[in-house]
A protein has these predicted regions:
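Conserved N-terminal structural module of periplasmic/extracytoplasmic solute-binding proteins
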Residues: 22-23, 27, 31-42, 49-50, ...
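Surface-exposed loop and turn segments in beta-propeller and other repeat-based domains
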Residues: 68-90, 128-142, 271-272
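Conserved C-terminal helix/tail region of periplasmic/extracytoplasmic solute-binding proteins
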Residues: 290-292, 605-728
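Extracytoplasmic "Venus flytrap"/periplasmic binding protein-like
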Residues: 332-392, 426-428, 519-520, 530-535
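Hinge/lid segment of periplasmic solute-binding proteins
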Residues: 365-417, 541-545
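Extracytoplasmic/periplasmic solute-binding protein
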Residues: 407-411, 416, 439-491, 515-523
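Glycine-centered hinge/linker elements that transmit conformational signals in sensory
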Residues: 444, 473-515, 536-548
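Extracytoplasmic/periplasmic substrate-recognition and gating elements
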Residues: 534-612, 623-632
Length: 728
């Protein structure tokens, strides 16, 4: 744990250092204002200006600074109406939502008043005003969305969203001439994004009849020439120009397109999901700037040829923050996402020896099993990672190791635990928690007979709200996990399963329409959080699902997503570094979920400051109460003091991000963890369980009679045997 903390501290230092270095960098706007994000950007000369929620920021010569402080406008950014109070109105008027430039001057636009400002010397100076009807649709009383903004040849180009509720996807290009104050609307339809052009008024991307980027002439209102057609589902984000060539971002790559339509990969940016409407900019020196959340990525595209970075191709999904932070710490390695997440295509890529895929993130149970069993995964011989992997819960080790060889590392864990509202359960004196389905049905009977009328806002268990087919599906899933053998065979023609189905049939009246229960469940059949979470001060406590029969050990079934390396990859050393990085930087909760050795509680980062503020406010109220002589005012202060004390008690419930009690409860449950990753009937990544579910729906959609149990079992067995034969 000490090592992890040291690494995290080092990472913060590295991020700060990298963000202000020359070359390819990632500016982090939270370094100048907490919670800041980049909304809009443009270059004026060699200075990059970025508009965020709280200000306009400038980056020049490796220095990031605040150019204009707009933090007082934060509360008014989405207020469409001008406040009546003049002080508030003066702040509202400067709540700009976009910045743009003519190459010499920086401008900002207020999206509701239509006021255009010059941004100079740390201030917003009114410059000109858009006609009201450009942005405001009077007939339907709403403001049009501004999807794109750029300026060229003295004209402001605004790509606007729909002007009527019947055509939600409609866009319209409005052109405002600064000199004449005239407004023109383009007749071109299907425009999705715009950018400042070179040798033309504008670059537009249309997605109407064709997926095409055009050079646009405002005087003729025509697309003069085609820049390029895009294939398939590709869409350009962050369009800009550099030395007469189009530059845009798609699929983690910054492309440069020449006049013949040929494109080169000039750089990589760790953004998996790019929006067409995202604006970008490129300086005269060839530094391309692309915003994403709190970061602005700068990439030098001035060098000849394509990027020489080591590129790892990942098939699967990881946290976007993980990719961003890895790229900052390892600028020489780019991780890009493959186009598909389809499990069969993952296996096909491995089977064919496709060396273009370096990394997989696959599910267990699911695609992981075939990759492991058929030898498609590379050994991960990173010593520190292997040592760490051997400290994980045994059920996880059983999945990721092949003997002593590490084949992958878990990056997320999905648990099939249940949850009980411990607070209300104890308040209602409901006794012991049920540990078998028979006990659960008995508890439901007692609830319906003795509690339901008195507690209409609650119900005993959510299985009362899912129908017999949902209940049987849950039981079958647990039965398969417990009884499927190593070859993938499972028989439902057993006394255990037959008795259980008979029990369901005998108790189906509990789930009949006359016993419908739609209050908040005291027992929920899903995982709500690590150990203990809170809902309106009620303690929601993790519990193990009931067993199928009395005397059985309660178990905790789980699925994991495993990051692993393709045996065909030619970049395995870089891939190992990425896996090790991800393992080291998993989110805190996942670290606790997979490591039994992590037992130190974690205090909430906001707890102390919040508690100090509330206690200070309470002391002020108590002082005022002690000095107050007016009885009526004292009564009011008493109410305020009581309310403040309740707030303090509520905050104290949230003292811990990870509490000692949560750790104890989770570790006790996780000792019974099993991951049936070899199952042919897993509900994650296999058709086998889907076929069983179809049988259950056929026989149980309207309930289950005892006379139907044999037929249900026969059909489940038939499907189970068929799945077994297909896999052998």
């Amino acid at each position: 744990m000490k090592k992890l903390c040291a690494v995290l501290v080092l990472l913060v230092m590295l991020v700060a250092a990298v963000a202000f270095a020359e070359g390819d960098v990632a500016l982090n706007l939270t370094q100048v204002h907490d919670y800041e994000v980049a909304d809009s950007l443009c270059y004026v000369g060699d200075t990059l200006y970025m508009l965020g929620t709280y200000g306009v920021y400038a980056y020049q010569g490796g220095e990031l600074s605040t150019a204009i402080d707009l933090s007082d406008t934060y509360l008014y950014r989405y207020n469409q109406e001008r406040p009546e109070d003049e002080t508030e109105a003066s702040i509202w008027e400067k709540a700009i939502s976009v910045i743009f430039t003519d190459g010499q001057t920086l401008y900002g636009l207020q999206p509701y008043s239509g006021q255009i400002f010059q941004l100079t010397e740390g201030k917003l100076e009114p410059y000109t005003q858009l006609p009201e009807d450009i942005l405001y649709v009077q007939s339907d009383d709403f403001y049009r969305e501004i999807k794109g903004t750029t300026m060229n040849n003295g004209k402001l180009f605004l790509l606007l969203g729909t002007d009527n509720y019947d055509e939600y996807d409609k866009t319209e290009l409005a052109i405002f001439d600064f000199a004449t104050q005239d407004v023109m609307y383009s007749g071109i339809t299907g425009i999705q994004s715009i950018a400042q052009g070179e040798g033309c008024d504008l670059i537009i991307y249309t997605q109407d009849d064709e997926n095409t980027i055009w050079k646009y002439n405002a005087n003729s209102d025509m697309n003069e020439s085609e820049v390029m057609k895009l294939e398939g589902m590709e869409a350009p984000s962050g369009m800009a120009f550099y030395q007469g060539k189009l530059v845009y971002f798609a699929d983690n790559r910054v492309y440069e397109v020449d006049e013949a339509g040929n494109r080169l990969v000039k750089a990589y940016i760790p953004v998996q999901y790019a929006m067409v409407s995202t604006s970008a900019a490129c300086s005269e020196a060839g530094v391309y700037a692309y915003p994403y959340a709190n970061h602005v990525f700068l990439r030098d595209i001035s060098k000849d040829g394509e990027s020489t970075q080591t590129v790892l191709t990942l098939m699967g999904s990881v946290s976007p923050d993980m990719l961003v932070n890895f790229s900052i710490e390892h600028p020489d390695v780019a991780v890009v996402s493959a186009q598909t997440l389809n499990s069969s295509e993952i296996q096909q890529a491995a089977l064919s020896g496709d060396d273009s895929i370096d990394l997989f993130v696959v599910s267990a149970p699911g695609s992981y099993t075939a990759l492991k069993e058929k030898g498609y995964l590379a050994a991960i011989d990173n010593e520190s990672l292997c040592v760490d992997a051997k400290t994980l819960y045994p059920a996880i080790q059983n999945v990721i190791f092949d003997g002593e060889t590490l084949l992958g590392y878990p990056i997320s864990l999905m648990l099939d635990s249940w949850t009980v509202n411990e607070t209300q359960w104890k308040n209602m004196e409901l006794g012991e928690y049920p540990t078998t389905y028979a006990e659960l049905f008995d508890k439901i009977k007692v609830w319906l007979d003795e509690y339901a009328l008195d507690y209409p806002d609650y119900t005993l268990a959510d299985i009362q709200q899912m129908g017999i087919d949902g209940l049987v599906t849950m039981i079958v899933k647990a039965y398969v996990a417990q009884n499927e053998n190593e070859d993938g065979q499972v028989s439902f023609d057993t006394e255990e399963f037959r008795s259980l189905m008979a029990l369901v049939a005998q108790n189906q009246q509990l789930f009949a329409e006359e016993n419908e229960q739609w209050g908040m469940p005291l027992i929920s059949s899903y995982y709500m959080g690590f150990g203990i979470t809170y809902a309106d001060r009620d303690a929601m406590v993790m519990m193990l699902p009931p067993t199928l029969e009395k005397g059985q050990q309660q178990t905790l079934n789980a699925n994991i997503d495993v990051m692993c390396i393709s045996a065909s990859s030619k970049k395995q050393e870089a891939a190992k570094a990425f896996v090790a990085y991800c393992a080291e930087h998993l989110d805190q909760m996942t670290q606790y979920e997979i490591h039994p050795s992590m037992i130190a509680p974690v205090e909430s980062t906001t707890y102390k400051a919040r508690l100090e503020t509330l206690n200070s406010e309470l002391n002020d109220l108590q002082d005022r109460y002690a000095k107050e002589e007016n009885d009526e005012k004292k009564y009011t202060l008493e109410d305020e003091i009581t309310a403040k004390q309740e707030m303090i008690a509520s905050v104290e419930d949230g003292k811990w991000a990870i509490s000692p009690e949560s750790i104890e409860i989770y570790r006790k449950a996780a000792e019974q963890m099993t991951i049936p990753y070899q199952s042919k009937f897993s509900s994650n990544g296999s058709d086998g369980f889907g076929m069983l579910s179809d049988v259950i729906l056929q026989y149980c959609a309207d309930g289950l009679e005892e006379s139907e149990v044999n037929a249900l079992i026969h059909e489940l067995n038939r499907v189970a045997d068929m799945v077994y034969m297909e896999n052998h």
